[in-house]
């Protein structure tokens, strides 16, 4: 993402059996009883666990801190308060004291950033997202599922060189490695903007979910440098 190429890292992580939407199931266990994280809330968002079916925002990962709600490679937020200077605004300072790196989509700038002509889809303006991702990082999102069953999720993202993620549900493996396709576009003359070519991966993940509260864990497996914005879940057909 903007400015993050200064932290370029080459990672060699073997990937096995990458699938488009592997479903292994996720039986309930005592994970929820022992889990110390809590659903995200602040002065603007007070709706409790994010709803499925519906659009789940990655930036609304759980409260609880490092090792509980998330694991990040370093304690600094390289988006909020760093790239986006602390100026008292909600977006620039969003969760700036936490290790997960967060930014938001910016429109109307010169040159264009997230409303650029190289997008595969145009994201909403001022959309918060998790970025600066690196292999080995993860974050938890508590959700409330309306009805038990299998759900399919579309991922809104950018990735300048591809990568892979994996999902757990309630502490149990729920997918195999899922390939994220690169959004790199050689026709874009601005190298930093390779982190801002937005795309929508339809039916990116399928999860079998119980009714009620569950915790989704998103694991970054390979490459990193992806921006993960939303997962839009609906009942699988």
Q: Which residues does each PLM region occupy?
A:
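Bacterial N-terminal signal peptides that target proteins for export
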Residues: 2-12
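Bacterial N-terminal signal peptides
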Residues: 10-20
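Extracytoplasmic
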Residues: 24-237
């Amino acid at each position: 993402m903007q400015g993050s190429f200064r932290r370029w890292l080459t990672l060699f992580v073997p990937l096995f059996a990458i699938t488009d939407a592997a479903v292994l199931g996720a039986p309930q266990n005592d994970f929820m009883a022992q889990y110390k994280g809590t659903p995200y809330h602040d002065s603007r968002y007070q709706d409790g666990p994010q709803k499925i079916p519906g659009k789940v925002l990655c930036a609304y990962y759980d409260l609880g801190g490092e090792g509980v709600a998330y694991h990040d490679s370093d304690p600094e937020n390289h988006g909020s308060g760093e790239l986006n200077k602390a100026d008292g605004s909600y977006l620039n300072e969003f969760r700036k004291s936490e290790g997960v790196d967060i930014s938001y989509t910016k429109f109307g700038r010169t040159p264009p950033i997230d409303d650029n002509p190289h997008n595969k889809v145009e994201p909403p303006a001022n959309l918060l997202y998790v970025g600066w991702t690196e292999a080995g990082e993860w974050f938890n999102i508590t959700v409330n599922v309306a009805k038990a069953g299998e759900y399919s999720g579309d991922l809104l993202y950018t990735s300048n060189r591809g990568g892979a993620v994996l999902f757990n549900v309630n502490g149990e493996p729920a997918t195999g490695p899922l390939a994220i396709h690169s959004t790199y576009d050689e026709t874009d003359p601005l190298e930093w903007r390779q982190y801002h070519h937005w795309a929508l991966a339809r039916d990116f993940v399928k999860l079998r979910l119980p009714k009620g509260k569950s915790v989704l864990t998103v694991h970054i497996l390979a490459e990193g440098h992806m921006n993960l914005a939303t997962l839009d879940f609906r009942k699988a057909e």
